[in-house]
Structures are given as structure tokens and as C-alpha cells.
Amino acid sequence: MAAEACVPAEFSKDEKNGSILSAFCSDIPDITSSTESPADSFLKVELELNLKLSNLVFQDPVQYVYNPLVYAWAPHENYVQTYCKSKKEVLFLGMNPGPFGMAQTGVPFGEVNHVRDWLQIEGPVSKPEVEHPKRRIRGFECPQSEVSGARFWSLFKSLCGQPETFFKHCFVHNHCPLIFMNHSGKNLTPTDLPKAQRDTLLEICDEALCQAVRVLGVKLVIGVGRFSEQRARKALMAEGIDVTVKGIMHPSPRNPQANKGWEGIVRGQLLELGVLSLLTG
């Protein structure tokens, strides 16, 4: 069975290949305009990315594909409009959403409690067109806590106190917005995809990343985990974009090192990168 990058269930199959998303996309100003806000320009990049991703079809082992930039667009747009009102010096870059984080809330590393209670972001969340019975989308009613997201935002809450302090200079984004699962509901990362499908997907996401970096005026991309760091470096170098790319340890509990004091390790990494002063000032 092939899995498609889905649009919301309320969109008909005839509309799936772009008419609805094209109309939605046209509501956001041209990213080349000098008059719109960084948030509007950033959202335009993401809507154009959605349009390209909606045409992809994935083969085994992928059986289910979720795109929270479609069914959780409302809280995602709220996140961008709230915290992307100005250009950003630093972009923290994740790989792709987790099933109990951004998949539920539309916010990168979006563990429900931190998104709702610290970031103060909420919004209606619908459903993917096809849901795995073990990976239901419950939005802000999701009872599971994503460990990676909880660790990530807890660190910056501790460092910054208020989200406005963090977002004064920084923003958080994922390289790929799609979530992949096999027949059992096991999470698959982009690296688990067959090479041809993976290469096509990542090239599309690379292009969108380069556009986002330009739109935000980013000077430093910090990959959260090795994949994000390496992918960002490759994409930006290929486009001749002169931006520094560094990395920090991923907070995933599947990373044994992250279970041995991730917060302390990453505080040290941020200090070495010269970013800590941006987060505490």
C-alpha cells in the first residue's frame, strides 16, 4: 500500500493535488516582498512546501503519513505569528515531528504542556486523512508527554524565564514537517525511507529551509541532533548561503547520552557557541 502526504479529511480527493492549498497559499504575500512581516513570509514558505509535499507518494515501509502543517495549521500559525514578528539571529532546527509533540500541537518539539502553559499557544486541531489506530491525533488533549519536547522547552524556560526572551533572537523549526509510520504504527524518520523517496523528500525540504533562512535573516543554524546539523550544512552550502551551522545534542530518550544530564550538556554547548548570552539577556 502506498501512503500519500495527506490534506485534511474535509478536502475532497479532487482538491488534494493543490487547488485548496494553492488558494490558501495565495492569502500570504509573496516572500520576495519587502513589506510583509517575517511571520507572513515564513508561513508562505511553509504553505508552498505543503503544496509540493502533497504530491508525494511513499512506498513500504511507510504506511501512514501525517502533516501537522495541514491538520494542526491553526496552532502552528498562532506559534509563528506570535513568535516570529522580527528577523532572527539563531534558528534551532529539528529533523521532523514526533508523534506526541508537533504531531499533536503543530509546534516544533511541541510537548503539550510546554506549548500550552509556557508558550501560551493553542488552537483547534483536526485529523490526518488516514489515522493509525495506535497513533491517534488528540491535539491538546493528548495525554502522553513527548520527552524530547519536554526536555527542549524546559531548558529554554529555565534559561530565559519568559518565551519572549528566547524568541527575541531565536526561532525553532523542523527540516521536514511530515511524520511517517509503518504498518504497526512505529515511527519512521526520513532516514528510514528508501533512498529514492528520501532524496526527493529531502531536496524539497532543503529548498524550503534555504528560503526560511533567507526570510528570517538567520546568521546561525543550530541543528538539534547530527542529522539536522549535517542536512542544514549541505543544503545551505549548495545554495551558497553564508550561514554558520553548528549542532547540539538531541534530547531524545533513545540517545543514551541524553539520559545522562542532557540539560547540563547542552548548556555547555550553547556557551561554547556563544548563544547563551542571547538567551539570558
UniProtKB/Swiss-Prot annotation:
One Pfam family in the UniProt entry: UDG
Gene3D superfamilies registered for this protein in UniProt: Uracil-DNA glycosylase-like domain
Annotated positions binding substrate: M95, F109, N174, H250
Gene Ontology terms describing biological process: base-excision repair
Stretch list, region DNA-binding: 182-198
CC annotations in GO: nucleus
Annotated compartments: Nucleus
SUPFAM superfamilies (alphabetical): Uracil-DNA glycosylase-like (SSF52141)
EC number: 3.2.2.-
One Gene Ontology MF term: DNA binding
First-level EC class: hydrolase
Keywords, comma-separated and alphabetical: DNA damage, DNA repair, DNA-binding, Hydrolase, Nucleus
Cleavable signal peptide: none
Family from the record: Belongs to the uracil-DNA glycosylase (UDG) superfamily. SMUG1 family.
Function of the protein: Recognizes base lesions in the genome and initiates base excision DNA repair. Acts as a monofunctional DNA glycosylase specific for uracil (U) residues in DNA with a preference for single-stranded DNA substrates. Does not exhibit any enzymatic activity towards G/T mismatches.
Record protein name field: Single-strand selective monofunctional uracil DNA glycosylase
Organism encoding this protein: Xenopus laevis
Primary gene name: smug1
